């Protein structure tokens, strides 16, 4: 029996994993163009943020916010390197790791070659996560440069149209960085599902589909999205104020 025939269900599970991850990424990008979602709504808030920044002389708070966002990406990039080091350590002692997994009752036994492929796939997911978070950090650096080069209020030679264009560009750069951060988080979510692959390929496929459902609900139907798109109505005038009027 060939390697493919012996591990057909594992290979099908890996293909299903790629379809779930890549398919949801494409779907979320397509649906977000004409549907309110976290990414599109936050981009509108970033545009408001940049327009209001141009009305302030002191931009320390704006630079601080971008710095905090960059540190979040830096934390995940550093954590990813630690995870990769652990995966490579296990890969170096794969024979012992396979024997330890075989002692767990719920774990479906697999060959050493298949177990090494699983570890390599898991490592590839977190390599992608590292490059994504590092690119996110660089884009936040670009955003910090844009904030530093923003025109001041007293610069009369800068037209209103140029200010609006600058605010749109700066908001777009920040949104691009946030999208990369989102892609990195997704790689963590899907990377966690690969742990189920060591238990059972069926559980792996189920967990992959479950992560897609969780991501979809959070992106398009979460409570925080409802709060951000909510537009409050005009507050009623108190009775005392009506009598005074």
State the predicted function of each range:
Residues 3, 148-157, 162-171, 218-245:
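Cytosolic/matrix-facing juxtamembrane and C-terminal tails of multi-pass cellular membrane proteins
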Residues 4-15, 106-122, 201-206:
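Hydrophobic alpha-helical transmembrane segments
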Residues 64-88, 115, 176-207:
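Transmembrane alpha-helical segments and their cytosolic interface motifs
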Residues 1-2, 83-108, 197-216:
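Juxtamembrane "helix exit" motif at the C-terminal ends of alpha-helical transmembrane segments
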Residues 128-197:
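Alpha-helical transmembrane segments of helical membrane proteins, especially in multi-pass transport
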Residues 96-111, 116-153:
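Membrane-proximal helix-loop-helix units in multi-pass membrane proteins
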Residues 28-69:
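Membrane-interface amphipathic/juxtamembrane segments adjacent to transmembrane helices
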């Amino acid at each position: 029996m060939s390697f493919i025939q012996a591990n057909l269900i594992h290979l099908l599970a890996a293909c299903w994993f790629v379809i779930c991850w890549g398919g949801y990424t494409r779907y979320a990008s397509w649906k977000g163009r004409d549907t309110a979602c976290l990414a599109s709504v936050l981009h509108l808030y970033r545009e408001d943020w940049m327009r209001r920044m141009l009305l302030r002389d002191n931009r320390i708070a704006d630079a601080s916010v971008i710095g905090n966002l960059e540190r979040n990406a830096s934390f995940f990039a550093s954590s990813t390197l630690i995870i990769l080091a652990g995966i490579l350590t296990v890969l170096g002692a794969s024979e012992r790791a396979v024997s330890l997994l075989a002692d767990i009752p719920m774990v479906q036994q697999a060959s050493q070659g298949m177990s090494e492929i699983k570890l390599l796939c898991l490592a590839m997911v977190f390599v992608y996560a590292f490059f994504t978070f590092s690119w996110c950090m660089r884009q936040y650096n670009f955003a910090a440069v844009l904030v530093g080069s923003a025109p001041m209020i007293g610069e009369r030679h800068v037209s209103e149209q140029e200010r609006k264009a600058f605010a749109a560009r700066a908001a777009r750069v920040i949104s691009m960085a946030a999208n990369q951060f989102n892609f990195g988080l997704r790689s963590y979510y899907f990377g966690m599902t690969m742990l189920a692959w060591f238990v059972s390929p069926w559980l792996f496929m189920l967990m992959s589909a479950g992560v897609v459902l969780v991501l979809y609900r959070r992106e398009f139907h979460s409570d925080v999205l409802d709060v951000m798109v909510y537009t409050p109505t005009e507050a009623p005038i108190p009775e005392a104020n009506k009598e005074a009027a």
